[in-house]
């Protein structure tokens, strides 16, 4: 399993496209974006107070205050915003400042109004010293010209959009959403809207959930439909999808039964072909990974629960990789103690669904065909390949479903 996670790295990446900020949330930048100019662009006050030369306040205290001549005020309002203050702070002088006001020339700090008082007309008393830069945001403190604002490969967050907007960047080059075609296979599979089921039929639950997971990972799900258990029908469907797909997902048919045709068909689609067929994971052992004519292909088990577990661990990273995401957001996780022993076999990675209450993780068990185990779970615990189980009371990391 570790080899599959680290070793299967298809070269395909979606191209870049320009995206206005209004539609850029969670999109993946195709190139770093740098600041076109300094931010905020001017030195400004972070407090209400007085702009001063810091050296004029050295040594002052409650018992030995200093006195400065009040020579003017920086104002805020539609008339003065956008213009430089026509005031210079000279030695022994101070200028009244509002929060956000442009620092006048000559000043290198702002003393908070709480540490001053006006003792007579044109004179203020200062009882606390300030250091250079105190109470001030430098002209390039948020970003210097040419500094990186957002990196390539990390999905854009709301705060990233705020930084770009502050810099006047209104369009970002982002990777196009990878088109992920999702096929279901099996004569027994019918659409979810089927009102009644004949004996042996099942509604296509996997395709609905897989499409949702593709969208969560930043992809564009494309329904491939339900393909019968007939190799030539599957081959025709896959060949038809290859030119318009960045990734193909095949639900069911990857096992070794007489009606499981995925591996044989994928071998004929194009080079380099199958990378691996069978992964040391439970559930999901018969998973297939391939690359055909530059398009990654993932074949999943037929049981919906197994398919969704494997796709979360292998398929979601593939969707992100093809979509240029090299810095995926961290999965939410909590630490909890196991409520009971978890047996496992060395050499196999086990994914165990759990409920978490009061810092205790209770394992949920059931047949791999049961979706109710997934819907009841708060998250999952991974038993690593080198372990032979985990004892009750062991502290584990639980990956929480979003």
Please name every model-derived segment:
Residues 135-250:
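Phosphate-binding glycine-rich loops and their immediate beta-loop-alpha structural context
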Residues 53, 96-98, 127, 151, ...:
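Short beta-strand segments
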Residues 74-91, 110, 211-270:
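N-terminal small/polar loop signature for handling phosphorylated ligands or for N-terminal nucleophile
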Residues 104, 158, 256-258, 306:
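Short glycine-rich, flexible loops that bind phosphorylated cofactors or substrates
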Residues 57, 100-101, 187-188, 253-259, ...:
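Short glycine-rich anion-binding loops that position phosphate/pyrophosphate groups of nucleotides
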Residues 1-170:
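Phosphate-interaction motifs
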Residues 16-17, 21-22, 31, 44, ...:
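Flexible glycine/proline-rich
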